[in-house]
Amino acid sequence: MANYTAADVKRLRELTGAGMLDSKNALVEAEGDFDKAVELLRIKGAKDVGKRAERATAEGLVAAKDGALIELNSETDFVAKNGEFQALADQIVAAAAAAKAADVDALKAVKLGDTTVEQAIADLSAKIGEKLELRRATYFDGTTETYLHKRAADLPPAVGVLVEYTGGDTSAAHAVALQIAALKAKYLTREDVPADIVANERRIAEETARNEGKPEQALSKIVEGRVTGFYKDVVLLDQPAVSDNKKSVKALLDEAGVTVTRFVRFEVGQA
């Protein structure tokens, strides 16, 4: 008896881009363990596995002000374009900056006029007739640079980047914010990547190389090369600079005398 459902197959196909048969086989091999099935498809080379699996379903916007960055979600893009919804987001991010609210729970409790942020969201949700959610919020108290990106001209910003830095000038910091928005770095340095994630990438790289029939004596070099490629995908300082791909982001920052201390990237609909 199958230990997975048709819905599991459909979800796995949507998340990974794999075909129906490959998805079924992965679920069988994983004995119904969904996360294991995703990993098996990665090893076997399914297109875009991992990247598509990060997606979540949501609409809404991101907003930034004076070291604060928030993501406010709606159910539809129709509401995301609503003037009252956008005005509320502006009020919330201003309140976040003023209160230096570093997370969602802290921000929900912040006063907004005669009410709280949490109640203001609930009130507008009841008025519009659609679920609204303050999904993410952060605040950096150092020198910061922000960048907001729209997916379409008639929609509010869907990608927001907040960078905290020291030294240099705003042009270098702005270039880094653009870099993070475009290439989706997750970590600042290699040391910031959790050891279990690196170990898993190394294991997947080795199993993939073996499945490809690579010679045993070459495996170590191949694995290290693929792990280095993984770092270039997810570590900001290791990434090739968008403005000059012959240099790393670290090299360009060193030239500009800028040190990035931390950053965050919010994208509507992204896990």
Swiss-Prot record:
Q: Does the keyword Protein biosynthesis apply?
A: yes
List the subcellular locations: Cytoplasm
Give UniProt keywords alphabetically.
Cytoplasm, Elongation factor, Protein biosynthesis
Q: Region (Involved in Mg(2+) ion dislocation from EF-Tu) spans which residues?
A: 76-79
Citing just one GO molecular function, the answer is: translation elongation factor activity
Where is it predominantly found?
cytoplasm
GO CC annotations on file? cytoplasm
Give the top-rank taxon of the lineage listed in the UniProt record for this protein. Answer: Bacteria
Q: So what does this one do?
A: Associates with the EF-Tu.GDP complex and induces the exchange of GDP to GTP. It remains bound to the aminoacyl-tRNA.EF-Tu.GTP complex up to the GTP hydrolysis stage on the ribosome.
Which NCBIfam families does the entry mention? tsf
Family in the record: Belongs to the EF-Ts family.
What protein does this entry describe? Elongation factor Ts
Gene coding for it: tsf
